[in-house]
C-alpha cells in the first residue's frame, strides 16, 4: 500500500448513533463552543508538559500531533463531550463506540476490528497532556484492548474554549453529589475552582494545595506505589503546568 494511503478515512467526523441522547444545556453550549475552534491548534497542546500516566514523569520522547492525529482529535473531542456525564465527569461511551461513531475504527479482510487510531490518540496524547484521565476496567472480554473509563479534566474544557468561570457557573446549578462514586473516580483531581485559587497563591502554598489534592485523589495503595519521590515529581509537574497555563492566559 502506498505510504500516502496508510491512513483509513483521512477526514473523520463524529456521527452519533440514531438513539438521540437528551443533552444538558451545558453539553449543548460546550459542543457549540468546540465547533467554533480548532482544538488541534490550541496553545495548550504546546504549553503543557506531557506526563507518563503510569510513572508521573515528564515524557522525554513524545509524539506531537501530525495531520492525521489532529484530524482524529477534531472528531473525538466533540464525541467525548456528547457522551459526557456532568455529575460523574465520565464519558459514558467506550473507546470502541467513540471510534465507531467518529470513523476511526477499521475492519480487516478477515473481519477483525481495529480501534488503534482512537485508542492511541487517547493513551498517547490526550491522557499524557492531561485532557483526560483513564481508569482500567476489570473485564473478562476476549478483545485485544483493555476497556477503560474516560474522565474529562478541567483542562479538557479549556481545550474546548470554555473558561473556568463558565463551567463553574454550570456546575453550581446542575451538579448533584453522587454518594456512590468511588474516591478515585471523583473527576480530575484539581477542579476549575481549585486551579483559580492555586494560581493566585505563592509557590509554597500552591504546592501544598496540589499535594493535598493528590492525596485526596489517589488511594492509599496508589500513594504507597508512587512514593515520596514520585509524589514530589507529580507536584513539580502539576505546578509547572499551572504556571504555564495561567502565564498564557494572562
From Swiss-Prot:
InterPro entries: Plasmid_replication_init_RepA. The keyword 4Fe-4S does not apply. GO terms for biological process: DNA replication; plasmid maintenance. Keywords: DNA replication, Plasmid, Plasmid copy control. The keyword S-adenosyl-L-methionine does not apply. Belongs to the IncFII RepA family. NCBIfam families: RepA_IncFII_LM (NF040977). This protein is essential for plasmid replication; it is involved in copy control functions. This is Probable replication-associated protein repA2. The gene is repA2.
